[in-house]
């Protein structure tokens, strides 16, 4: 009998949400996604000890204030993790723009371009990379510009249809609507448990997927942030799903039948709309869950980025002693 993971691969592009080199080599996903939390975890493994030494040695040769140097070294380390993953997957690796730039379009553009240039310096072309940006109004505007420059983007921390519509308007390459974090919010808010079919995160991604397919929107829908295998199974057939190694392993061990839940052919009419800035901000204001989870996600990624920069500062100080 074929595993559910293999059945899923027949209808959905499977992406690994990890920086764990061994897991990626074993599970053989098409793409990989990273974020500051994943980069920080990867750098804590022996596999990246040499990369840390190299980045710190490079940092010692850089001028400028200590904060700028530590930020540049942190960027270099994130690229090191991404470059290692690129060697293991046939597709793309997502690298995230600093979370503390989520409300600054111009700074996000500068950072994204520098990430692409850093990969280029390592012989990795832009067609192997996705630039991850938070789905704020400013992040979406940055993505719109980058897409016109031939830099494909992955819009993350997406919790609402308003964000998905704005991303479609901007013609971004890919969106990552979250599932598990939406479920977390509703469970905390209502005190209820939800089956996979009732799961508000699953329902949200299905609605976005249907809207895109109903209107022939080319942006790829990649479900993200899963709490259990049931959520993944409930979105079988989605364009892509980015999944943690633990849940990939669980699906690989399950030889039950996987039913396709999503397909372009099953789309239902859903009139196409566009959103300007004031409409976007109002729709987000009216969606307490999306507003809270977006802000929470940005804070969490910014915290991990600060932790990484602090680690780098300590390494630089030790190297200078």
From Swiss-Prot:
Cellular localization per UniProt: Cytoplasm
Reactions mediated catalytically: D-sedoheptulose 7-phosphate + D-glyceraldehyde 3-phosphate = D-erythrose 4-phosphate + beta-D-fructose 6-phosphate
A GO term from the CC aspect: cytosol
Keyword rRNA processing belongs to the record: no
EC number: 2.2.1.2
SUPFAM superfamilies in the cross-refs: Aldolase
Broad EC category: transferase
Chief location category: cytoplasm
Annotated active site: 132 (schiff-base intermediate with substrate)
Molecular function terms from GO: transaldolase activity
InterPro entries: Aldolase_TIM, TAL/FSA, Transaldolase_1, Transaldolase_AS
A Pfam family matched in the record: TAL_FSA
Annotated pathway: Carbohydrate degradation; pentose phosphate pathway; D-glyceraldehyde 3-phosphate and beta-D-fructose 6-phosphate from D-ribose 5-phosphate and D-xylulose 5-phosphate (non-oxidative stage): step 2/3
Transmembrane portions of the chain: none
Keywords from the named record: Cytoplasm, Pentose shunt, Schiff base, Transferase
Functional summary from the UniProt entry: Transaldolase is important for the balance of metabolites in the pentose-phosphate pathway.
Subunit structure: Homodimer.
Name this protein carries in UniProt: Transaldolase
Organism: Rhizobium etli (strain CIAT 652)
Chain's gene name: tal
């Amino acid at each position: 009998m074929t595993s559910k993971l293999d059945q899923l691969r027949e209808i959905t592009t499977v992406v690994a949400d990890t920086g764990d080199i061994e897991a990626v080599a074993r599970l053989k996903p098409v793409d990989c996604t990273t974020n500051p939390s994943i980069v920080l975890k990867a750098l804590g493994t022996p596999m990246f000890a040499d990369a840390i030494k190299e980045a710190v040695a490079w940092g010692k040769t850089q001028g400028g204030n200590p904060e700028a140097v530590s930020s540049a070294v942190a960027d270099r380390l994130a690229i090191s993790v991404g470059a290692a993953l690129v060697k293991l997957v046939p597709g793309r690796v997502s690298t995230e723009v600093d979370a503390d730039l989520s409300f600054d379009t111009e700074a996000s553009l500068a950072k994204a371009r520098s990430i692409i240039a850093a990969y280029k310096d390592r012989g990795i072309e832009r067609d192997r990379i996705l630039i991850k940006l938070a789905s704020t109004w400013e992040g979406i505007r940055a993505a719109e510009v980058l897409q016109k420059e031939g830099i494909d983007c992955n819009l993350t921390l997406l919790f609402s249809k308003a964000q998905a519509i704005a991303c479609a308007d901007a013609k971004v390459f890919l969106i990552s609507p979250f599932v598990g974090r939406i479920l977390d919010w509703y469970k905390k808010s209502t005190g209820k448990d939800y089956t996979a079919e009732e799961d508000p995160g699953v329902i949200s991604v299905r609605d976005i997927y249907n809207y895109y397919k109903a209107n022939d929107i080319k942006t790829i829908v990649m479900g993200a942030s899963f709490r259990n295998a049931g959520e993944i199974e409930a979105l079988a057939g989605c364009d892509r799903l980015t999944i943690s190694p633990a849940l990939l392993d669980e699906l690989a061990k399950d030889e039950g039948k996987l039913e396709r839940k999503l397909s372009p052919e099953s789309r239902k009419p859903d009139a196409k709309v566009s959103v300007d800035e004031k409409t976007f901000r109002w729709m987000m204001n009216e969606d307490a869950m999306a507003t809270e989870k977006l802000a929470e996600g940005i804070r969490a990624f910014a915290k991990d980025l600060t932790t990484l920069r602090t680690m780098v500062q300590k390494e630089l100080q030790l190297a200078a002693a």
